[in-house]
């Protein structure tokens, strides 16, 4: 197996590959936690390539640069901060000041502004719309995700965005069903197991 295919295989098993969630939520979920503590899956340019491939963003053969890695991480952190604001997330470390929120808004908007637009050109004396010019496919993909994040956080679905309060979880999700309370089945099972354990301890204490 080549190193690129090995990376893609590893990516497919990571916590942020949540096919039912919108891309901004999947980007936020590149920060996740387990029994070993928090993990960051966007540490290198290759990580950005793997993530874009896994979520279906076409890189057109381009590879993320160090600047695009910085942009991806900054966008991810900004969207997480704004999600915490929208959901009134009171998990440890999630709270943010008004200045932080303003800076996060600037980051999302600046990233989205990189979307390529058709260019007006003069051909044979006539004005025509030419093909879009602009950044690399990686930057364009991140700009599209930033645009989707703005729509999610500021649109009708913002009211369905939730923080997952399962023990140790740091993820967010869009509540697609009235009874859904957790980001995943695994988190739901962990909560139920914790409740069962606590009830058993309470019964022992009453005996």
Functional labels for PLM-detected ranges:
Residues 168-173, 191:
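Cys/His-rich microdomains that often coordinate metals
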Residues 26, 191-194:
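Alpha-helical elements of the RecA-like P-loop NTPase motor core of helicases
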């Amino acid at each position: 197996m080549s190193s690129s295919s090995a990376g893609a295989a590893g990516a497919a098993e990571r916590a942020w590959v949540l096919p039912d969630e919108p891309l901004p939520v999947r980007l936020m979920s590149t920060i996740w936690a387990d029994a070993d503590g928090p993990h960051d899956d966007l540490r290198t340019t290759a990580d950005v390539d793997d993530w874009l491939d896994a979520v279906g963003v076409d890189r057109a053969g381009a590879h993320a640069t160090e600047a695009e890695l910085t942009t991806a991480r900054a966008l991810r952190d900004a969207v997480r901060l704004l999600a915490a604001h929208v959901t009134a997330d009171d998990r440890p470390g999630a709270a943010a000041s008004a200045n932080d929120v303003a800076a996060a808004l600037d980051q999302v908007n600046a990233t989205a502004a990189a979307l390529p637009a058709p260019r007006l050109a003069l051909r044979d004396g006539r004005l025509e719309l030419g093909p879009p010019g602009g950044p690399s496919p990686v930057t364009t993909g991140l700009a599209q995700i930033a645009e989707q994040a703005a729509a999610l956080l500021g649109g009708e679905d913002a009211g369905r965005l939730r923080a997952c309060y399962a023990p140790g979880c740091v993820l967010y999700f869009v509540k697609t069903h009235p009874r859904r309370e957790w980001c995943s089945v695994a988190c739901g099972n962990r909560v139920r197991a914790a409740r069962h354990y606590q009830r058993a301890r309470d019964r022992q204490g009453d005996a």
